[in-house]
Amino acid sequence: MDEKNLPVKKAEKGIIMQRYTDYDETTVRMIQPVHDELTYCGRIDHSDPDAPVFVQPGSFVRMSFTGSSWVRAVVMNHRSYNDSWVGVLSDRNQYRVKIEKDEEPVVLTLAENLERDTTHEITLFKRMDQCHTYVFLGFLVEYGARVEKARPLPRKKIEFYGDSVTAGEVSEAQNYAGMPDPPSEGEYNNAYFSYAWATARRLHAAVHLVAQGGIALRDGTGYYENGTRGMESCFDRIYFSGEKSGEPRWNFARYTPHVVVVAIGQNDAWPEDIMKNDYYGEQAQQWREHYKAFLCRLRENYPHAWIVLTTTILNHYPGWDRSIGKVCAEIRDPKTVHFLYQENGRGTPGHVRASEAMQMALELSGFIEGLAPDVWD
């Protein structure tokens, strides 16, 4: 792994502007983030087009090129916890690369020993949730390489709101399928193997994952940020925490999904499992009212989308799913539906592994395809 320094200059309003210049222009070509032929997907902070910040899991940038035997990426990582890994798809081969340093530019070798006279496709994607974010400063290829128009995103669009299961946390610990999680520092986390991204691939759809490990619906519950931040106050943000958690807000006009999947209602049992303790009690009713209000806010942003309400196969008390079904019936929205997996709430005590996620994707994609003939219109 090559690591080089990056000149950094401060711009107005305290915004940090990064430009990578430490390379030999006689042998290396820099592909800037604003290059017309790059394809982006995901809830990415493009406030500075020359230095987009990858925040949400599954976000990616894709490039097609010829004339280079290798390709590298320049990133600047900000780590909150866990080790930091990026995901790579090189001509459809999927693997990971570790970011060894934080708060300084790092050059990551994404692929090498490529045939120069062949067109290659490279995708740099965010494997993990907001345990880290990174600034993308461009690709490096051999001098004389040609960038070609990248494969376009599918016409179909889907979006997921969820927690660690939706983000693909610990999905690569395949030897622990159906078991509690092994000790790890994030090396098993991979959004590519989440049921969410797998569902999108089965449907041949573009996907946005708005997901964070530990998050619940309501502020003051769940594990994320010690329970201070819930999805109800984060769903319209790019960043869920830190100095940028308030701004910039996400512009919903940038991505209009045909289908929205809401998979919240598992971490909500912490610090108290209110559905198990008293399903008809005041706290449980308050949760259902907050859930209903959240759905109304989603509907305001997506007036024509199908909204699928669900949880996952991660073990949890079934009262949460009954509450979701109750809200679904009460709102009387013909395009808001409730879905349960075959092993819903009882499939595993640990996070969902890749094989389990593939089964979930099979069930969910089949359900979505059966919603209506015009689901993708």
What are the functions of these language-model segments?
Residues 348-377:
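Histidine-centered active-site loop/cap adjacent to the catalytic His
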Residues 291-295, 325:
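Generic structural signal for well-ordered alpha-helices
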Residues 304-331:
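C-terminal hydrophobic structural anchor segments
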Residues 278-285, 348-351:
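The substrate-binding groove and active-site-proximal loops of carbohydrate-active enzymes
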Residues 5-188, 375-377:
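N-terminal secretory targeting modules
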Residues 340-345:
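Short glycine-rich catalytic loops that host catalytic nucleophiles or stabilize transition states
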Residues 73-76, 161-162, 210, 263, ...:
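Short hydrophobic segments within beta-strands
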Residues 56-58, 181-280, 306, 314-319, ...:
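Conserved SGNH/GDSL esterase-like catalytic core that processes O-acyl groups on lipids
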